[in-house]
Amino acid sequence: MDLGVRVSGHETVSSPGQTELGSGFSNKQERSGFDGEDCWRSSKLSRTSTDGFSSSPASAKTLSFHQGIPLLRSTTINDPRKGQEHMLSFSSASGKSDVSPYLQYCRNSGYGLGGMMNTSNMHGNLLTGVKGPFSLTQWAELEQQALIYKYITANVPVPSSLLLSLKKSFFPYGSLPPNSFGWGSFHLGFSGGNMDPEPGRCRRTDGKKWRCSRDAVPDQKYCERHINRGRHRSRKPVEGQNGHNTNAAAAASAAAASTAAAVSKAAAGTSAVAMRGSDNNNSLAAAVGTQHHTNNQSTDSLANRVQNSRGASVFPATMNLQSKETHPKQSNNPFEFGLISSDSLLNPSHKQASYATSSKGFGSYLDFGNQAKHAGNHNNVDSWPEELKSDWTQLSMSIPMAPSSPVQDKLALSPLRLSREFDPAIHMGLGVNTEFLDPGKKTNNWIPISWGNNNSMGGPLGEVLNSTTNSPKFGSSPTGVLQKSTFGSLSNSSSASSTIIGDNNNKNGDGKDPLGPTTLMNTSATAPSL
């Protein structure tokens, strides 16, 4: 390659293989990383004279890349002014360079002996005057990106190898920061810090150099082994939880069904009394319903003995002795069914049943034969089924006082209620009417039932309970202790109570029961609590 350089005087080339100064620096290149021939070829300075030198004084300015840096080529030049050899120095006095800016950048970038500069595409692009701070890697990436762009514009799928090689070429060692090229962080949307060099591989690591060798689950970061590593170990699978919930629901539904069946059976066995309103008279129906007393467990066996003592049950089959499922709370209403006088409780003679009550129209609740007489009070109770009336046990009950008696209101204060089921104290006044048994056996009907067991009891109460014959009509009871004021009875002595009762019975004139035969209207009668 010829270079036009003006040198004053005659020049003598010390190299025997070179006949001309501008023939090129092809044989003695001693500096690595700088290819002077390529740089001078790219400059293509024109020759202005036939002898290879330019006659223009302006062309005497030497080429300089940096000030004071020689080309390390030994050349002997006879200077008529000095007449000595000197090193050819391409330094410019004016500091102005005639070479293209690319040559200076080529010098600064430090290419090594050709390199990518010798490629046709790169060299062609450089000769067309491409300017900009691009390195070799940037040019390679630019060509690859241009190729990808051609694929995109041609509507052809981009090969994965082209994309992977492009991603791997971005900062493989992390040596160059993104902003060193002047393009900022523009790298096709990829970031060097978050980029995965192996996209399809599990990303589970030990925090240092080890990485899982398994392939990751599609659309996940980790493999099947490590995908659930971050979850709590005690967490059960969803399928197991669903199965457990279904089993629990099935068990709960079965229990609910069995409970409903038991309740329906209990409801079928109990009375079908429909209570209406919240009046005090409706507490009769609540007391007539099943009531449970847990303090005395001997009443169950006692009721069974009452039913099975004669072979034929005193109480009909429609009467449920005690319900095991339902336990309604005991009402504290003083007008309940079962407010009785203690004298009639303790004197079984004169057909005095222990169901003597003090409420005003109580006979209308139990007397189906005299409903016309008490039509005013009957509207508080729902109509009873006719098929149940025939099965109910009829009792001969005597109300010892007239309905208009002034002492009747005092009797309402008695707390003795029919709260215990089939209490023995009631059965000593409980007898079967002559409709069922022979009148000759009527004396045996009033034999009192002993407490819980058949053992005889001592004391005044045992004397009354163990009596086998009818006591005198107005016999006094020695059990004055039961006639205390806490019971709210008519007086503090049983004799006085008997006298008042006898007087009231005489006032009726005919001496008959003012209510007549009444019918027990409950399927589960309750007994007084002592």
From Swiss-Prot:
Extent of Polar residues compositional bias: 11-27, 519-530
Intervals of motif Bipartite nuclear localization signal: 201-211, 229-236
Keywords per UniProt: Activator, Nucleus, Transcription, Transcription regulation
One GO location term (cellular component): nucleus
Keyword Ribonucleoprotein recorded: no
Gene Ontology MF: a single term: transcription cis-regulatory region binding
Biased composition (Low complexity): 485-508
TM stretches of this protein: none
Residues covered by the WRC domain: 196-240
InterPro entries: Gln-Leu-Gln_QLQ (IPR014978), GRF (IPR031137), WRC_dom (IPR014977)
Residues in QLQ domain copies: 133-168
Family: Belongs to the GRF family.
Protein name, entry field: Growth-regulating factor 1
Species for this entry: Arabidopsis thaliana (Mouse-ear cress)
Encoding gene per record: GRF1
